[in-house]
């Protein structure tokens, strides 16, 4: 038996389905910091401007970890979907950031046609 796929959406509804049960808010977070060497390289890049790929990569990885943690919580609840998903980022200390992802875990059923 495979892992149940859970729909993740910023929408509040899923076309063709209705929310049968609201299971509650689910969330996932992680705090990440950059390696000192990469931090120095990124600091040098700020002098000339442009994207800081070291931080872009770190934040992308952190979002993936936070989302996986949120989905694990949704899976434990038996959710079919997590709706209204939002991401938040906060600096927790010099060189470290928290990524938080949250939404509403729901069970869905096909919408009845009228």
From Swiss-Prot:
InterPro entries referenced in this protein's UniProt entry, alphabetically: UPF0145_dom_sf, UPF0145_YbjQ-like
UniProt xrefs under SUPFAM superfamilies: YbjQ-like (SSF117782)
Tree of life domain: Bacteria
Gene3D superfamilies: Hypothetical protein apc22750. Chain B
Pfam families registered for this protein in UniProt: YbjQ_1
HAMAP family membership: UPF0145
Family to which this protein belongs: Belongs to the UPF0145 family.
Protein's recorded name: UPF0145 protein TT_C1581
């Amino acid at each position: 038996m495979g892992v149940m796929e859970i729909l993740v959406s910023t929408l509040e509804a899923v076309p063709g389905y209705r929310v049968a049960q609201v299971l509650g808010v689910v969330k996932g977070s992680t705090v990440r910091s950059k390696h000192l060497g990469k931090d120095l390289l990124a600091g040098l890049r700020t002098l000339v401007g442009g994207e800081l790929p070291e931080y872009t990569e770190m934040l992308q990885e952190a979002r993936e970890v936070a989302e996986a943690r949120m989905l694990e919580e949704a899976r434990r609840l038996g959710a079919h979907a997590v709706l209204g998903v939002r991401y938040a980022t906060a600096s927790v200390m010099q060189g470290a950031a928290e990524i938080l992802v949250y939404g509403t875990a729901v069970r869905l059923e096909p919408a009845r046609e009228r």
